[in-house]
Amino acid sequence: MAIGVGGCCAVLLAAALLFSSPATTYAYDSLDPNGNITIKWDVMQWTPDGYAAVVTLSNYQQFRHIQPPGWQLGWTWQQKEVIWSMYGAQAIEQGDCSMSKEGSNVPHSCKKHPTVVDLLPGAPIDLQIANCCKAGSLSAFSQDPANSAASFQIIVGHSGNSNETVRVPKNFSLMAPGPGYTCSRAMIVKPSRFLSPDGRRATQVLMTWNVICTYSQFLAQKVPSCCVSLSSFDNDKTVDCPTCSCGCRNEKSTTGKCVKKNAPDLQSIIHGPGRWTWQPLLQCTSHMCPVKINWHLMLKDKEHYRVKITVTNLNYRMNFTEWNLVVQYHPILDITQISGFNYKSIQVGKINDTTMLWGVKPYYDLLMQAGPLGNVQGELIVRKDFRASSTTNNNKGRAFPVRVYFNGDNCVMPPPDAYPVSITA
């Protein structure tokens, strides 16, 4: 048990998730300007040589989620702190605890720069707390707000045990599981307050500090990770993803390694030595993107377009759980009906021209690895808004999206002059 704070933490944690709200910060994405992951430390109780705290990671990004192998949270202690024990998460290294006194308990971690990960589902009950043990996954806030947060409890020693003697950690880092996030300094804020279930009593923690982490696709990777192709029922030509959208095929380089989909040794390569690594093994294409989205115009009449969207995974070593698309389209269009997808409109400023799509459970929410099952499909019926159309000077390519995001990453679009001619005429 957690030094007498297990029950207290469970109640306060539930209240924290209910009453917490997104913190405002500057982000990198114009479609989600306030998106961030907020890390909140709530000191619940002082201990003889430190404190017990509940740490909560809240994903306030509207359409970017974290999937297994999940988040990794790191920091640097400012004094000689140790982690006596943890619940709901674990430090990946114990470090050198040889300075522990004989006969005393050995700390969970003595690292100056600890890195913490979530526990897996099915972890022992006595190591769990509320909202833990999801293999590091954090759902996007718009897609599944109930699963957009994770928590763990940490018992810290050799740290001081008062507001005056505790030094907040520094140099926070968040991997998800790769790079891309930049974290702020820890800022001491007003202690979190919670209401009792009956709403008649308010309590507050002893001390709270926040860290805000924002994402940059540029920091995460040097090349894009998805691309868009366009096609139409009344044109035989498919406008494919631009060549080298996500890199160029080069069998002599590591980043350009790929395997042909009809290679006779395909299965042995997929299940070879690199099977358990997170290095991508892509199907050879002209664009070399791990994910391809095809926007196909199935039908058009005076008032509507009917569109089929196909999302194809071209990575043999990764599937995508809780994937999502964000589609920004021309203001003259209005989505009226959707099949196979859940959807939510995203208001960007005063213009409502962006929609978030994700797969309906349990049929389309998992995008399998490259192969016969490595795609998901859905259909849209889009109504033309003639009032907006009359004020729009350039309706060229209006049946096609302006921008497409996959799991929060901006996908490479074909150039406008390459759109199917019959639609742009």
Curated annotation (Swiss-Prot):
Sorted alphabetically, the Gene Ontology BP terms of this entry are: cellulose microfibril organization; plant-type cell wall cellulose biosynthetic process
Q: According to the record, which residues are glycosylated?
A: 36, 163, 171, 319, 352
Task: List keywords of the entry alphabetically.
Answer: Glycoprotein, Signal
GO CC aspect terms: plasma membrane
The signal sequence is 1-27
List the InterPro entries hit by this protein, alphabetically: COB_C, COBRA_pln
Which superkingdom?
Eukaryota
Q: Which Pfam families does the record associate with it?
A: COB_C (PF25079), COBRA (PF04833)
State the family named in the UniProt similarity comment for this chain.
Belongs to the COBRA family.
Recorded protein name is COBRA-like protein 4
Query: Which organism was this protein described from?
Result: Oryza sativa subsp. japonica (Rice)
